[in-house]
């Protein structure tokens, strides 16, 4: 069984047991979360497509922990004026494991 879920503007295709990296959420490692915006649920025999969401469908997941992404360097430069600014950013992510898909 698989599902397509939407989480804060991004869509993911998930299956039970899959480890997924999503944008940071405020949840403790080891806790259970529910992702309620299920757009599609399918298996070998049938596919349920929501309009826009599948009624009563929920994806449950376990929070594994947090991690940071690669550093993005932003460099601003203006010629002939000695103007240079260098800043960096590291996005924080949450790693989750999909426990079950309830449709």
From Swiss-Prot:
Entry GO CC: cytoplasm; ribonucleoprotein complex; ribosome
Molecular functions per Gene Ontology: rRNA binding; structural constituent of ribosome
One of the GO biological process terms: translation
Coiled-coil blocks: none
Pfam families: Ribosomal_L21p
Physiological role: This protein binds to 23S rRNA in the presence of protein L20.
PANTHER family in alphabetical order: 50S RIBOSOMAL PROTEIN L21, LARGE RIBOSOMAL SUBUNIT PROTEIN BL21M
Protein name per the record: Large ribosomal subunit protein bL21
Source organism: Chloroflexus aurantiacus (strain ATCC 29366 / DSM 635 / J-10-fl)
């Amino acid at each position: 069984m698989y599902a397509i879920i939407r989480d804060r503007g991004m869509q993911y295709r998930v299956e039970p047991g899959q480890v997924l990296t999503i944008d940071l959420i405020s949840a403790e490692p080891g806790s259970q979360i529910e992702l309620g915006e299920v757009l599609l649920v399918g298996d070998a025999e049938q596919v349920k497509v929501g309009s826009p969401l599948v009624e009563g469908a929920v994806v449950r997941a376990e929070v594994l922990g947090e991690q940071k992404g690669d550093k993005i360097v932003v460099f601003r430069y203006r010629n002939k004026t000695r103007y240079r600014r260098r800043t960096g950013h590291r996005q924080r992510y949450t790693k989750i494991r999909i426990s079950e898909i309830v449709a």
